[in-house]
Amino acid sequence: MCAQYCISFADVEKAHINIQDSIHLTPVLTSSILNQIAGRNLFFKCELFQKTGSFKIRGALNAIRGLIPDTPEEKPKAVVTHSSGNHGQALTYAAKLEGIPAYIVVPQTAPNCKKLAIQAYGASIVYCDPSDESREKVTQRIMQETEGILVHPNQEPAVIAGQGTIALEVLNQVPLVDALVVPVGGGGMVAGIAITIKALKPSVKVYAAEPSNADDCYQSKLKGELTPNLHPPETIADGVKSSIGLNTWPIIRDLVDDVFTVTEDEIKYATQLVWGRMKLLIEPTAGVALAAVLSQHFQTVSPEVKNVCIVLSGGNVDLTSLNWVGQAERPAPYQTVSV
């Protein structure tokens, strides 16, 4: 694996050893109805059943355990991060396991259920405006005040390596898999998965999926350079509002085969399909990946890509904000970038 990347496959292997005793081996489920709709064999990696309700515990726990020194006296005074909710919950849970205080910078617009969950796990919440600039500024201030160590939600190498353990499990659970489809925000999960897949089974495709309202990953691939969102994105998929960053971009640029964008209606439709057909209460961010596969444009993907694994990234749903339920129409075509 090229030395220009922030992690190697060896880091993912170490992460697997580091965290496997404290996370769930999440199931892979199928749906014959969704297979018929998609025209492919779909396999759903159910990270909504993971501890803290999303895949984020993998990276958070790997990062926290990497901070634990040989002597208790050297333990960090605190850990700090910014998060729309899921990473904040995961980091707080992981830090609590090791007896470390956690401070989470949360956008004021984050779902209420996620804010309450972060508090329930024992973190101190600090609010910020829903922009990358505000998050970074407030995070730096809290780090100075607490003398805490930053655990970035998607650019920290230990976090990326932890998320890559998803792919290790998928290759064992679905040995004939042809492709993985992963929702992308900051890119930690898709980068970790891409590193793992291309090291172990490079013929398997890795596709990223994101809202068209937050399409920095698509734009970056299109232009061949890192192109962050200029304005705070408006999307119901709150877990993928962040832009990809300096550590995830090179991996995405080189190892992710395609980036698909989907509309808000497509996300709503796909999310409700999973609710109705599979009886799984996923959050809209998890619906982004299925929305990509159900789009007409995905039909241009080779029919040889028959067995497709979709990562259902989380299930932390704010039930009080579901005023859009029943409003979505069937998906329409969307964009893709081929490399």
From Swiss-Prot:
Residues where S-nitrosocysteine is found: 113
Binding site for Mn(2+): 210, 214, 216
GO biological process: D-serine biosynthetic process; L-serine metabolic process; pyruvate biosynthetic process; response to lipopolysaccharide; response to xenobiotic stimulus
Binding-site positions, Mg(2+) 3: 210, 214, 216
Modification note: S-nitrosylated, leading to decrease the enzyme activity.
Residue positions binding Ca(2+) 4: 247
Required cofactor names: Mg(2+); Mn(2+); Ca(2+); pyridoxal 5'-phosphate
Top-level taxon: Eukaryota
N6-(pyridoxal phosphate)lysine sites (modified residues): 56
Consequence the record notes for mutating residue 51 to A: Impairs ATP-binding inducing a 80% decrease in enzyme activity
Sequence positions that bind Mg(2+) 2: 178
Binding site for ATP: 31-33, 51-52, 89, 121, 279, 316
One of the Pfam families matching this protein, by short name: PALP
Signal peptide location: none
GO terms for MF: ATP binding; calcium ion binding; D-serine ammonia-lyase activity; glycine binding; identical protein binding; L-serine ammonia-lyase activity; magnesium ion binding; PDZ domain binding
Reported tissue expression: Expressed in the hippocampus (at protein level). Expressed in the small intestine.
UniProt-annotated binding residues for pyridoxal 5'-phosphate: 86, 154, 185-189, 313
InterPro entries, alphabetized: Ser/Thr_deHydtase_PyrdxlP-BS, TrpB-like_PALP, TrpB-like_PALP_sf
Residues at which Ca(2+) 1 binds: 69
Protein name: Serine racemase
GN (gene name): Srr
